[in-house]
Amino acid sequence: MATRKSAAPNRSFKVSDQIQRDLAELIARELKDPRVGMVTLQSVEVTPDYAHAKVYFSLLVGDPQATQEALNQAAGFLRNGLFKRLHIHTVPTLHFIYDRTSERAADMNALIAKAVSSRGKEE
């Protein structure tokens, strides 16, 4: 007897990926808020019922808090734009979260470089 794998995780991944691509385009082309600068969408996590989506973003320059506030204020506008593009029954409510991974990586690299340089001086 063959067991059937659930397609839900794969579909959820596809929906998250499509939301990420469409949101990136909407933010770049249609969002006119000056607080939103060079935003990179890192990932999108959608709840199993597609009611909510956490959208993780990073910035090249700018104030992360102001950008997060601007994106969350524009969430309804962006969700409406997704309605026109996505062919799913429920378009999730968007929640934008600043992703500090790149900052942490830069801090770790700086600490490693400092440790290596201080070790070189001791020898």
From Swiss-Prot:
Keyword Cytoplasm on entry: yes
GO cellular component terms given for this protein: cytosol
Organism of provenance: Delftia acidovorans (strain DSM 14801 / SPH-1)
PANTHER family listed in its UniProt record: RIBOSOME-BINDING FACTOR A, CHLOROPLASTIC-RELATED
Pfam families given in the database record: RBFA
Oligomeric form and interacting partners: Monomer. Binds 30S ribosomal subunits, but not 50S ribosomal subunits or 70S ribosomes.
GO terms for MF: ribosomal small subunit binding
SUPFAM superfamilies: Ribosome-binding factor A, RbfA
Signal peptide: none
Family note: Belongs to the RbfA family.
Function: One of several proteins that assist in the late maturation steps of the functional core of the 30S ribosomal subunit. Associates with free 30S ribosomal subunits (but not with 30S subunits that are part of 70S ribosomes or polysomes). Required for efficient processing of 16S rRNA. May interact with the 5'-terminal helix region of 16S rRNA.
Name of the gene encoding the protein in the UniProt record: rbfA
Alphabetized UniProt keyword annotations: Cytoplasm, Ribosome biogenesis
HAMAP family associated with the record: RbfA
Protein name: Ribosome-binding factor A
Top-rank taxon, per record: Bacteria
Upper taxonomic lineage: Bacteria, Pseudomonadati, Pseudomonadota, Betaproteobacteria, Burkholderiales
